Amino acid sequence: MGGVFVVFEGGDGAGKTTQARLLDQWLTTEGIPHLMTREPGDSWLGQRIRELVLSPGSGPISSRAEALLYNADKAQHVDEVVIPALREGKVVVCDRYVDSTIAYQGAGRALDPGEVGQLACWATTGLVPDVTVLLDVDPCEGAGKIAAKDRLEAAGDEFHLRVRQHFLDLAAAHPQRYLVLNARKSRKEISEAIRQRVTGLLNR
C-alpha cells in the first residue's frame, strides 16, 4: 500500500496527543508528506459518534453499544481517511486506533477483549500500524490530573487500571510493533525516541 502508519496509544493524561503533534511538527519541518488524524472523530460520521460516546451529557450507553459505536467510527475513518493517505505514500499519524478500543471497551468495560479485537479487525479490514507508540503512565498520574473529564476519563480508577494493564499486555504480545515509553520522561527524550523509530521506518 505504501506510506507509514504511526499510531499513538496510552491512558488518559499520558501525553500521547502532545507527542503526536510534536511528530506532526517534525514531519512538516522535514518536508515529509503526512497526515495527522485521530479516533474517534476524524470523519463526518466520526464527529457525530465522538459527541455521543464522549460527552458527559449523553445518556447511558451500554458497553456493547459503545464498542459498536467506536468500531463504526473506525470503519468510516479507515476507508475515508487512513487508507487513501497511505496509498498516496504519506506518513499517517493517528491519535488512538484499534488497541484503544480493545483496551477501553474490552478490558476497561469488562467485555471479552478477543471479541472486541475481532470486531475492530473486521471494521478496519485488518489494517495494522507499522509502529504503535505506547506512552505508559500510572492512571493516578494521568487521568487523575485531568480536571474536565469526558465519559471515559471519568470512568474510575479500576477502569483505568484495567486499561493500562491491557495496553501493556498488548505490547508484550506484539513487541516488534510496539514502542513503549515511560510517559514520565521529558518531552524531548520521548519525542527523540519516536523520531528515531519513525526515521527507521522511512528508510526501510
From Swiss-Prot:
Q: Which GO terms describe its cellular component?
A: cytosol
One of this protein's GO BP terms?
A: dTDP biosynthetic process
Lineage: superkingdom? Bacteria
Which InterPro entries does the annotation name? Answer: P-loop_NTPase, Thymidylate_kin-like_dom, Thymidylate_kin_CS, Thymidylate_kinase
Query: Its catalytic activity?
Result: dTMP + ATP = dTDP + ADP
SUPFAM superfamilies, alphabetized: P-loop containing nucleoside triphosphate hydrolases (SSF52540)
The top EC class, named as a word, is: transferase
The answer to whether keyword rRNA-binding applies is no
Q: Which Pfam families match?
A: Thymidylate_kin
Q: Which Gene3D superfamilies match?
A: P-loop containing nucleotide triphosphate hydrolases
Q: Which CDD domains match?
A: TMPK
Q: Which residues bind ATP?
A: G10, G11, D12, G13, A14, G15, K16, T17
One GO molecular-function entry: dTMP kinase activity
EC numbers for this chain:
2.7.4.9
Name the keywords, alphabetized: ATP-binding, Kinase, Nucleotide biosynthesis, Nucleotide-binding, Transferase
The UniProt similarity line reads:
Belongs to the thymidylate kinase family.
What role does it play? Phosphorylation of dTMP to form dTDP in both de novo and salvage pathways of dTTP synthesis.
Q: What is this protein called?
A: Thymidylate kinase
- Phylogenetic classification of the source organism: Bacteria, Bacillati, Actinomycetota, Actinomycetes, Propionibacteriales
